[in-house]
Amino acid sequence: MIYPSPYPDVVIPETTVTTHVFGSTEESDTRTALIDGPTGATTSYGELAGAIRRAAGGLAARGFAKGDVLGIYSPNTVLYPIAFHGAAYAGGVVTTVNPHYTAGELASQLRDAGARFLVTTSACVEKAREAAEEAGGIEEIFSFDDAPGTTPFSALTDGAELAEGPQMNPSTDLVALPYSSGTTGGSKGVMLTHRNLVANMVQLDGSESLSRGLTEDDTVLAVLPFFHIYGLLVIMNWALSQRARIVVLPRFELETFLGAIQDHGVTYLHVVPPILLAMAKHPIVDQYDLSSLDAINSGAAPLGKELGLAVEERLDCIVGQGYGLTETSPVTHHGPNKRRGQCPHGSIGPSLPNTETQIVDVDSGAALGPGERGEVWIRGPQVMLGYLNRPDATAETLDEDGWLHTGDIGYIDENGYGYIVDRLKELIKYKGFQVAPAELEALLLSHPHIKDVAVVRSPDPEAGEVPKAFVVADGELSADDVMSFVAGKVAPHKKIRRVEFVDEIPKSPAGKILRRVLVEREEGRA
């Protein structure tokens, strides 16, 4: 059974990302585009568009041409959009890199992507230099903040503008090359075209009949990293395409984050569940005026029903969630959020315009009906071309009919709303029964004395695997308390069988639980 979008199809313009976002923006446009969170300095849309054209000119003067790759290895900064769009306007491809990567990890990505130039910051410059030498092929390193031994990024923006970029085919020419472990393990370059990104922005626009869209009256807080596809497309590019204001923070620190919402009157917030957890439970939240917040959208990891409701009630604003992957540019589903209660908490909502969904039995491959759980398959114009230099991994993930096999387990209810249960490869097999860690985590987070939690498989000689909870406690709590709390609320095979108290849960910069770290620890003890 194929589940279509409830929204009418939208027309996807055959244009490049930079043209779609900025169009014919003139330097006389004084509307504020970017606000530097730490300093309060502002950049207008006119200034931003001019800087992008000059950055493109600076790159072109260095021989950067259509199809060439620029790496960005940096935390969030107001200069990030200039680097991204400067390269894009010049016809290039941008590979975004996690600034927490080691020199070896950075070198591996630069080498695989075939990068010619690299942009970084003082905080990352030593690793950048080491990686560039190891990778080979890097002709010049630029730094946003004039790090010693690099070319100042301003050298690209001080010269003449590139009057016109090269002729591009939006459907086949790449513009972004983020890296993802995907559904098959191992970091791989995700080939995203101009059309992929433009399509996803237009799809987000086209879901406004049920969802609260962005306008030039909105102020968005960019605390999630731009190197991640969620930050790059949804926070940075979609917001700029709608002429909203973006307050840019380099990292998440709770008090700085709350202060930015208060000081800049943030109206629309994109976060991940760990940030919502702090907003729901941390007492310091009450010290800030967050009344400007109108809508909060959560992504990158499943948001439990109880947590979403707790934040909504505490802050008196709409909390919803979306769903997607790096491989889908990223958004495929979004919960309607024009009013509270419009979308059931825990649901990712319906699919975006032009997007189809299937739920498929993981064993038989049969298409499933409403309420039946299986692997989520997606088809739409936001789906990637494939993985760079990895035809094997591409074939495992993208079938000949254009369906992307996500590796996520979920279901569609009778109203066409989607729910994500867990990752296929993260399911726990207890005596042959499947147990979804995310379901148990959402339940455990509703406990008043559990600050954070991760559930993983733990080897067991009798059951094969049992669910084990790693718990960050907030107050007096015993292992028996944790197990009994869950036992009364789930089927027997889903009970937590082991508990370990820890100081923190390992997570990626995007807020996803690093289960493999905990699983490897468990397997090492077996």
Give residue spans per PLM region.
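Conserved AMP-binding/adenylation subdomain of ANL enzymes
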Residues: V198-T219, F227-T267, H282
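Conserved structural elements of the adenylate-forming
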Residues: A49-G57, V190-R212, V223, L276-L277, ...
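Conserved AMP-binding/adenylate-forming core of the ANL superfamily
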Residues: T30-T77, P81-H85, T102-A107
